Amino acid sequence: MADKKVIFVAFAIEDERQRDFLKGQSLNTDSPFEYIDMSVKEAYDSKWKERVRTRIRRSDGVIALVSKNSLTSSGQKWEISCAKEEKKVLGIWAYKDDRTNLVGVNTVVWTWPAIEKFINSL
């Protein structure tokens, strides 16, 4: 397995459970990938953008959990915009029956091989 990579996870708060599933996959001993979640858990405030940008800069890449909720999540939109300026971004669809597209984000089906390929490319 490649060295452990630091990954920032951008997600709409409504998709927090999916973020938890992604983190759980990384802890699975049979998982072909592992990462450190750098997402900002604090509530949105005046220094939030500064903290997000700092964490994205310290990350090797960004995974965006894409769903219909992404379209109305101002926080996730800003995280993705910042990430596109700073790092490599991979979108993964958060749900099997939701194929929302975000402009400028390469989004793929949530599979271990797809995530492993992205992480190994960092």
Please state what every model-predicted region is:
Residues 87-91:
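Proline-centered loop/turn at the N-terminus of a beta-strand
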Residues 69, 92-100:
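Short beta-alpha junction loops
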Residues 1-58, 94:
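Conserved N-terminal substructure of TIR/SEFIR domains
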Residues 68-86:
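Conserved TIR/SEFIR loop-to-helix hotspot centered on a Trp-containing motif
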Residues 110-122:
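C-terminal helix of von Willebrand factor
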Residues 46-49, 77, 112:
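Structural motif corresponding to alpha-helix initiation and N-cap regions
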Residues 97-112:
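Glycine-rich, charge-decorated loop segments at or immediately adjacent to ligand/cofactor-binding or catalytic sites
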